[in-house]
Amino acid sequence: MSELAEMMQEAAEAVRIHTHLSADVGIVLGTGLGALAGEVAAETRGPVTQIPHMARATVQSHGTELIAGKLGGKPVFVMDGRLHCYEGHKLADVVFPVRLLKALGCNMVILSNASGGLNPEFDLGDIMVIDDHINLPGLAGVNPLVGPNDDELGPRFPDMSQPYDRGLIKKAQAAAKKQKLKLRQGVYVMVTGPNLETRAEYRMLRNLGADVVGMSTVPEVIAARHLGMKVAAFSIVTDMCMPDMLEEANIEKIIATAAKAEPKLTKLVGALVASI
């Protein structure tokens, strides 16, 4: 057994002391899904700091709990809080929550984030289901899979032709239609942050084909796909990044926009889980 596999097993065993829940779905609560923690009929919950090998998030708007319970009548594990590279965490720490979910038996993971809108057809507060991504840090060699590979966990060269599960995207679209929610679909580009981008950088990212830009999610997606997990991910457009009409970023306004869209995304993800 590799060192990584041992770490995953140790973390899962620590969780199993408190719950024997069997769940196919794991959810990592990034921006826009914080309220979902309150929708879960919790069997048990506890701080991630009590779980071996789990780092702690420093972003104030993110929680630090692992919740085991039911959502929409379906058993789920919910990680309330995510880690970012810009906090100084190693990528292995950033993706470990997803690896723990796999060790607990989850075969699919749902993620969310906040993003800057690059597509001029998008509006502030829109929710986008991600159907592809551009991994700028990864193209520069920053990747959670760099290093020795454990073939029992996943292949050395995992395929990324369809990182976001088409079936889950269709279910999300169907749920949004029932809720009369305008659900965008598009490409997410990841940058490391924490600074926001320049006008020239926004222009370049749009020319590359990105619809939104953000600072998370992609490492977790790569780790999940390496483990054979299905992935669904959603992005809330919290500010518009039009290079020719760019205004100075207002973090308070960005957080407020995410909070306003949060009930819609919470309801959408709840319906998605219920349909699985």
Annotate each language-model stretch with its function.
Residues 164-227, 231:
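Active-site-adjacent substrate-binding region
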Residues 241-276:
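His/Asp/Glu-rich mid-to-C-terminal helical/loop segments that flank catalytic regions of hydrolases
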Residues 14, 18, 167, 171-182, ...:
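Generic non-transmembrane alpha-helical segments
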Residues 4, 86, 157, 161, ...:
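Glycine- and other small-residue-rich loops at beta-strand/loop junctions that grip anionic moieties
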Residues 152-164, 176, 190-192, 202, ...:
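Polyanion-binding loop/helix "lid" in catalytic or ligand-binding cores
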Residues 1-160:
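Metabolite-binding pocket within alpha/beta catalytic cores that recognizes anionic/polar moieties
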